[in-house]
Amino acid sequence: MKRRKFINQLGLGAAVLTVPNTVLSFTPSFSKANKEITFGLVADVHKDLMPDANGRLEVFIEQAQKRKVDFIIQMGDFCFAEIKNKEFLNIWETYKGPKYHILGNHDMDKNTKSEMLDFWGMPKTYYSYDFGGYHFIVLDANFLYQDNKF
């Protein structure tokens, strides 16, 4: 990149950052936000690969309930959409509060995205939600590059 172009882009980036509370601002509205929220994250449980996945998920749910987190999120590589995994999914459902799913790169090893959405009860591969004055955005980063296209 040429020096002049770099300096121009740097200046534009700095100008964008100085515009407060506009569409370009990504800070939460702290006047609406609760003082503190807590949530539990679990990732790479790999039900279909790890023999102790049920036990590990049970411990996660127990700890989330014990710590009284506001909600839980599983960050992908959870379980395939197969009848044998209904018991595992039922463990997840024992958490009494809000819970969210995110597709992982291995979740579609045996199933389509559509099958995973149906099995987990996800609204879409990407979605957003508000909690405690904060806005959370879940994105789908799982796109395969095949035949020169995504």
Predicted features, each with a name:
Residues I83-F150:
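Extended active-site neighborhood of metal-dependent phosphoesterases/phosphodiesterases
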Residues R3-T27:
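N-terminal export signals
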Residues G11, Q74, I102:
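Short glycine/serine/threonine-biased micro-segments
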Residues K2-R3, T112:
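Helix N-cap and loop-to-helix transition residues
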Residues L12, K66, T94-G97:
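Secondary-structure boundary motif
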Residues L17-T18, V59, W92:
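A short hydrophobic/aromatic micro-motif that marks alpha-helical segments and, especially, helix-coil
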Residues G11, H46, C79, H106-D107, ...:
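Short, glycine/serine-rich, charged loops/turns that create anion-binding
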Residues T22-E87:
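N-terminal active-site segment of His-dependent metallophosphoesterases
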